[in-house]
């Protein structure tokens, strides 16, 4: 959840929001409100972070997370797994992808993690599936880049 909190600050122009699990779309008239905190992070730093996270998706290991017509920003992660015999397990990793859709009507951040797997593409593809569904279900629209 700490990674989601960090990414939400980038996605929300420096406003730090505590993550919440979205179980269902709020009913009409129902408003969900949570506390937030301004971080005071410089706009230039936030723009640089978004640009770097976008390049992971456009030019790097996060390509499978991209959604046509949207600016997906995110980062893959890989961790070796300690072996009981010493050293690390061979060719199996704990992996993840955390990201958001920049320049959109949404503040959603999504983290997908998988333990003891062989391929990075699994988490990026699952992120893509989740966020494409969210785009449709919550009518998320893309906005012009700044």
Predicted features along the sequence, with ranges:
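Active-site beta-strand/loop architecture of penicillin-binding DD-peptidases
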Residues: 1-35, 53-142
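Intrinsically disordered, low-complexity repeat and linker tracts
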Residues: 144-146
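A conserved catalytic-loop motif detector
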Residues: 8, 41-45
């Amino acid at each position: 959840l700490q990674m989601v909190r960090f990414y939400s600050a980038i996605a929300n122009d420096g406003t730090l929001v505590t993550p919440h699990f979205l179980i269902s779309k709020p009913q009409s008239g129902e408003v969900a409100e949570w506390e937030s905190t301004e971080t005071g992070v410089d706009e230039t730093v936030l723009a640089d972070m978004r640009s770097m996270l976008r390049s992971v998706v456009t030019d790097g290991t996060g390509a499978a997370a991209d959604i046509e017509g949207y600016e997906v920003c995110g980062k893959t992660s890989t961790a070796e797994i300690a072996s009981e015999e010493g050293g690390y397990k061979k060719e199996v990793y704990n992996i993840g992808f955390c990201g958001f859709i920049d320049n959109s009507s949404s503040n959603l951040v999504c983290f997908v993690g998988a333990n003891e797997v062989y391929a990075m593409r699994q988490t990026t593809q699952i992120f893509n599936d989740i966020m494409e569904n969210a785009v449709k279900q919550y009518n998320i629209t893309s906005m012009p880049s700044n």
